[in-house]
Amino acid sequence: MARELILKLGKKITDRVDVKLGMTKLDENSPEYYGLASVVTDEMAELALAMKVRVPTTPAEIGKKVGKDPVYVEQLFDQMSMIGLLEYNWENADHHKQWTLPIFVPGSAELMNMNLQQVETHPEIAQFFERMSFLPLTKITCMVPPGGAGVGMHVIPVEKAIPATNESVDVEHISHWLKKYEGHIGVGYCSCRNAMRIQGEGCGELQDELCIAVGQFADYCRETGKGRDITYEEAMEIIQRAEDNGYVHQITNIDGEDKIFAICNCALGSCFALRTSQLFNTPNMSASAYRAHVDAEKCVACGKCAEVCPAGAAKLGQKLCTKTGPVVYPKQPLPDDNHWGEHMWSPNYKDDNQKQCHESGTAPCKTACPAHIAVQGYINLAAQGRYLDALKLIKQDNPFPAVCGSICNRRCEEACTRGDVDRAVAIDEIKKFVAEQELQADKRYIPKVITHRGIADPYPEKIAIIGAGPASLSCAYYLANMGYENVTVFDKNEVPGGMLTLGIPSFRLEKDVVNAEIEVLREMGVHFQCGVEIGKDLTIDQLREQGYKGFYLAIGAQKSAPIGVPGEELSGVYGGVDFLRRVNLGKKPRIGKKCAVIGGGNVAMDVCRTAIRLGAKDTYIIYRRSQAEMPADAEEVAEAMEEGVQFRFLSAPAEILGENGKVKALKVEIMELGEPDAKGRRKPVGTGKFETIEVTSVIGAIGQRVDLGHIAPEAMAFNRNGTVQADGVTYQTAQPDIFAGGDVVTGPKFAIDAIAAGREGAISLHRYVHEGQSLTLARDPREFYELDKKQAVVPIDCFDAPARQTVAHDASKAKTFSNDRITFTEAQVKAEASRCLGCGVSVVDQNKCIGCGLCTTRCEFDAIHLTRDVPEASRMYRTEDKMKAILPHMVKRAAKLTIKDIKEKCAK
């Protein structure tokens, strides 16, 4: 049965108009009731009912009202303050201590959640806070004028983003507030993040010390154990850390002009204050006086502004005109111009606001790259000679640019709009030039750790990475970059790198390049245990016993697929990746003078060229389709041909012939092409005609398989081809603490695909090892769309650009294990960069923009700025006076909509 005093207290404090007017009656299921009833006694409720909301009072005054001893009242007041029902107040002539009964939000609902032990014991308090930041606002948000009218919180911009020449006012500057309250500044845990964690809906933005208390509220937090004192300098460090993490600064907005009690650093996925504008699509509830604007001439569509924009206002579009004119982008409807209701809300705003690209498309290079590197951006920086900045930009999305500069399959170049004019920009060669700047230890770029807690307080959770290939290394890199100090990479091989080190020959990827980029991980604090086979030397259960909280399985597909013909057991028959591994470990497999390589992919090209370097005089590629169907990179095929490899197209192995247990010859069947298969390639069909080729070795390079070795298969589910089943978004396997990525999940793909998967694995592991975090909520989907190149109009001056630069070769390194490709010169890089058409651009919808300024912190091109478009948004009101601001705006809006309705009716 409901407690009567709690019902009365809930009605007294609530901001719900329907409850205040008696239209809705509270009961046990009302948040006002269950939130208070969980921790407030009837004795406390009796005292609170004798108080006025937001009016300071003393124990003596309340004791007199209720007929209680003031000493007893003060003791209860202290308990009520610890709970979070009351606040302290010293604003009086002699600064004696008073107590205040605050509103629920912002007020006691937050304070009750800041008592961490209390909310763990009573998780219903978290739901109480969430509901009380929602229910009172459902009918009113569309009527609120710019500035918020004293309702809740208000965005305050990144201070560096406010133009120096702008007519800003003091209340728009964070430094103003921190200087005003210097000596009374504190910090505490974020109540929104904590409430969402308790409800299992955290988004990876942890409830660490991020919310700054000022004035007497800071003193209250210290005295009640909800926070601690900090200096002005410490507060500014928190502000900077928040900006690094992409958190929005907000100030309380319920106390009138030039008065606040908190500066919060808010995350879209958790913040109930940001929800007031984002869920209801009513930016006036949050927005500052500023709006972001893009200088399209300077913008290079790196997309970093879109990544950080909490409102989904900044998105990637295209700079190139279409045949019908410039692309016109949609604007978010606003309540001042439209009838509003739930049909205009955005219930999925946490996910929708993560979308970074207009469906009409953006630069094809960024879209095509699996890691969605800011190609247009780093090309622009390289053109300016800002090579370190270019490297920093690349490594935000790809920790191994030097590796990829040597071996990437260049999907960005395949998609390049320039390729429809003449030839694609040599993107990979520019990246390689930029990346090789840091191969020298003294020039190495170590990224700044971006953690919620600060560099001095890293995450202690232990995470095991199984395998040391590109997916594993990428995952480890991003975890270290987040601030994890106990990331350990385990690999059964004696050296890290996986296929980068052992599966790709040095003449394509020099091992010093791989080692230099791995060394960056060591300097970031990643630990390596090589020569340790998980499942054999150490089991996953043993690692769990050692305190490991999460695992990333990325052991690749390092087992050669069998050729599947008689004679495969003969001496001189090798699997392609096994052969390359032995060579990379310094061994020299005996292949004789005549070697046949079965297959038509990149591994086959690596194998045949390696065979030449081991002394084979006659090397054959045996491929069952024609050259047109060959999946290997055309450039690698050409290089193999130049080195003397003989290609036998439309030939399939039938039998390996031997003598005295050794390979003597290869029998092949002549094929012809039939109907296309599911991938569009014509199927090879046997003709029944055979030929025999005299060879001394046969190397099968027809595919790779996953080999889990001694890792217990019962721990996970598998696909028919032996790959591990993992969620397509989170990469979580059937074992909740094991995530997987790279070739072990997809089957053989390219390094850049594995690198992209590693980043997603790190995001999932970060969320998983912290209790109450959703793996999917408010997660960046990394979805980009390519602009319609058929409709794009390229600028006339693009035809005056230089021809594509060509790679030179060092003749002295030909047919050796050294890479004979010569990196572009600086002049070549700048000439090649000038060929970029600059297809993409960022576009800001000012109707959605809340003027936080985070976009400006990410732009390296001076292309996005804030302007003070809505100065009235800096007007501050007391919550008691909110209707003085809302009513005039409501009347004006109603008149505007009436006129609009009449015009629309007349038009019909």
Predicted regions and their residues:
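Flanking helices and flexible, charged tails adjoining ferredoxin-like Fe-S electron-transfer domains
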Residues: 311-364, 379, 425-427, 431-463, ...
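Beta1-alpha1 glycine-rich phosphate/pyrophosphate-binding loop at the start
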Residues: 373-376, 382-383, 424-428, 461, ...
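A short, conserved structural fragment
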Residues: 81-92, 314-315, 864
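FAD-site-proximal beta/loop scaffold in flavoenzymes
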Residues: 569-593, 676-748
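Glycine-rich dinucleotide-binding loop and its adjacent helix/turn
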Residues: 434-457, 516-536, 560-614, 719-734
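Short, amphipathic alpha-helical interaction segments positioned at domain boundaries
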Residues: 95-135, 886
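Ferredoxin-like iron-sulfur electron-transfer modules
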Residues: 68, 99, 250-263, 279-308, ...
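A conserved FAD-binding loop/helix module that cradles the flavin
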Residues: 744-772
